[in-house]
């Protein structure tokens, strides 16, 4: 048990340096580590029971209730041939405006100082699962081909200057569905629009925008069209909007949630 906790602490410290949250060195309590690992275990059991090979998996790392949002971060989870589930997702390096794509286990995914110990996922249709699994099994360079390092947590849903984590996941989904024709972010976004995706519109006034831009390296608004930005309409990709879109577009089942008691 002591060895397991030590490993968890190391994993947690690594995530703090990459997940776009506070860079303060806060030692996690054994209780938080245990809860994160319990959530990972229970989620794995439920994913196994679903019969899925690939899901879009979300966590609640921040309190976004004032924006009407429940989940903060989205990844693509898949069941390996060996049995364990892995998650491919984009993480912001703390204190910076850059990000990269990582493959991690469920334990690491849920050890990121969660606001709420709840997992949620969508099981894609069999066709979408097949396409995603094929993409995930390709070379690493293929799965990250639409990733760009410049990062803003509120990047414009239809822009290419920045890219946040949820945006990478859904653009990667688009590329997996049309691998022969989608080779750029603009093409992926055109496919999303064709399928009826609608981003979340956040109402952020000028003082909120100014405070966010000055106080955080990973928040920028200059990629948003002026007519939207200056009317306080910030359109960005959120987990909640993706979860509403996929069933509507016939790409997946209704979202499933599990909350650790």
How should each PLM-predicted stretch be described?
Residues 23-31, 35, 61-192:
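Acidic/His-rich structured neighborhood in mature extracellular/periplasmic domains
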Residues 2-8:
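Sec-dependent signal peptide recognition
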Residues 8-10, 48, 78:
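Sterically constrained small-residue positions within well-ordered secondary structures
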Residues 5, 45-47, 141-142:
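Short hydrophobic/aromatic-rich motifs at helix boundaries and adjacent loops
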Residues 144-261:
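Activation targets extended, charge/polar-rich intrinsically disordered C-terminal tails
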